[in-house]
C-alpha cells in the first residue's frame, strides 16, 4: 500500500513521519495481517479444505497470517505456535478463539500442552526442516486430521545446493526436495493428498510448495500428485514475477 505525506509517497514499512502530518492510504489493503494468509487461502481453494468449526494449529505463526485466514474461514479455535516473541498481530492476540503460544518450539509440544486434539494444522517454518516438525505435529492431530505444510527448498536442500542469499533456483533440486519430504511423510504416518506451489515467493525470492497431508495408519500417495508438473508450473509462473 502507499502512504502519502505532504506529496511524498512511501511504499515500505518502517517509514517515519512528523506527528502533525496528514497521512492517506491508497491502494488495495491486504485481507490478512500478513501475506502468509494468501498461502493458506490458495491451499484451501486448491485442496478444497474447509475450516468451519475446526480446532487448528498454526505452526510458525509469526505475525499470524495463517491464523487470520483460519479464523476468517470459520475456525473454532487456533493454537498459534512460534519460537519468536512479539511478532503476533495485536488483533489476533485479543481474539478469544486464539491461544498464543510464543517462545514455543513445536518439537517439544506434547498433547498434554493443549486442551484439544487438532482437526487441522499448518506449517510455515524457517531455518528448520519439515522432517523435524511432522512427527511432533502428528502426535497433536486427531485420527484423520489434516495438514498443509510449506516446503521450502532453501531449508531442505544441502548447503552446496543453496545459492547466493539463500536462494535455490535449480528445478531439479526443487523436485528432489519435494520428493524427499513426500517420502518422509509417507514413512511417518501421513497420506499425501495433493501438491501445489505457493502463490508468492519467500522473502529472498525462493519458490515454495504447499503439500496437503492426512494422518493415517495406512499412508498412500494419491496418483494425482505430480511433483515434476507442479515444479515446472511454479517456475513458469513465478519466475516471470
Which residues are covered by each model-predicted region?
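Conserved SAM-binding loop of SAM-dependent methyltransferases across substrates and taxa
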Residues: 63-74
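Short, glycine-/aromatic-enriched active-site segment of Class I SAM-dependent methyltransferases
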Residues: 153-169
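Conserved class I S-adenosyl-L-methionine
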Residues: 52-62
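Short, small-residue-biased leader/transition segments that mark boundaries at the very start
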Residues: 2-9
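A short glycine-rich, Lys/Arg-flanked "PGG" loop and its adjoining helix->strand segment in the class I
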Residues: 131-146
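Short beta-strand element of Class I
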Residues: 76-79
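Flexible, glycine-/basic-rich loop-and-beta segments that form/coincide
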Residues: 207-241
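S-adenosyl-L-methionine
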Residues: 81-128, 132
Amino acid at each position: 500500500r502507499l502512504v502519502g505525506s505532504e506529496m511524498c509517497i512511501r511504499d515500505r514499512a518502517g517509514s517515519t513521519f512528523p506527528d502533525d502530518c496528514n497521512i492517506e492510504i491508497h491502494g488495495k489493503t491486504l485481507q490478512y495481517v500478513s501475506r502468509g494468509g494468501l498461502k493458506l487461502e490458495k491451499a484451501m481453494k486448491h485442496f478444497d479444505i474447509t475450516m468451519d468449526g475446526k480446532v487448528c494449529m498454526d505452526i510458525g505463526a509469526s505475525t499470524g497470517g495463517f491464523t487470520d485466514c483460519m479464523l476468517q474461514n470459520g475456525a473454532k479455535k487456533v493454537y498459534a505456535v512460534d519460537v519468536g516473541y512479539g511478532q503476533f498481530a495485536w488483533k489476533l492476540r485479543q481474539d478469544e478463539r486464539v491461544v498464543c503460544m510464543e517462545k514455543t518450539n513445536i518439537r517439544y509440544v506434547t498433547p498434554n500442552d493443549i486442551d484439544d486434539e487438532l482437526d487441522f494444522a499448518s506449517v510455515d517454518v524457517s531455518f528448520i526442516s519439515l522432517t523435524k516438525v511432522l512427527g511432533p505435529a502428528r502426535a497433536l492431530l486427531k485420527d484423520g486430521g489434516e495438514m498443509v505444510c510449506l516446503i521450502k527448498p532453501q531449508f531442505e536442500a544441502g548447503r552446496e545446493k543453496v545459492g547466493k542469499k539463500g536462494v535455490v533456483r535449480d528445478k531439479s533440486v526443487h523436485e528432489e526436495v519435494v520428493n524427499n519430504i513426500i517420502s518422509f511423510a509417507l514413512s511417518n504416518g501421513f497420506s499425501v493428498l495433493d501438491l501445489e506451489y505457493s502463490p508468492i515467493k519467500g522473502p529472498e525470492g525462493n519458490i515454495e510448495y504447499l503439500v496437503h497431508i492426512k494422518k493415517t495408519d495406512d499412508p498412500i500417495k494419491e496418483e494425482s500428485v505430480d511433483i515434476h508438473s507442479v515444479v515446472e508450473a511454479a517456475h513458469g509462473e513465478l519466475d516471470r514475477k
